[in-house]
From Swiss-Prot:
Keywords: Cell membrane, Ion channel, Ion transport, Membrane, Metal-binding, Sodium, Transmembrane, Transmembrane helix, Transport. GO terms for cellular component: plasma membrane. GO terms for biological process: cellular detoxification of fluoride; fluoride transmembrane transport. InterPro entries: FluC (IPR003691). This is Fluoride-specific ion channel FluC 1. Na(+) binds at residues 71, 74. It comes from Bacillus subtilis (strain 168). Na(+) is not transported, but it plays an essential structural role and its presence is essential for fluoride channel function. It is a multi-pass membrane protein. Fluoride-specific ion channel. Important for reducing fluoride concentration in the cell, thus reducing its toxicity. The chain crosses the membrane at residues 4-24, 31-51, 61-81, 96-116. It is found in: Cell membrane. One of its GO terms (molecular function) is fluoride channel activity.
Amino acid sequence: MTLAGIFIGGGLGAMLRFWLGNVITAKTKGLSLPIGILTVNILGALGLGIFTGLHVANASVSLIIGTGFFGAFTTFSTFSVETIQLLMAKRVKESILYIVLTLCGSLFAFWCGWTITI
């Protein structure tokens, strides 16, 4: 049951990431950073922070939502690809900014989500 739940949660998270990332990217065309995935990763970190702060006792629910949904909603691999693409295009300043915004923004968002549930 838990494995099926992770599968379903992951599918939903991935579909939401795909849709939201594309919507944000379309609305921010012309900007020098990949804002779609940046936003998705920060929102995912915030959501996971809130969920983690709730201290859900049911291990299956934690796996389905934490590992399944939020694991698929956020994406370190796409962040990595986009960073390398910026570097290969010799857009070093943008790549550094993207790295800093993604890492610091995600950590801060997780912390905010976690602390508001305390």
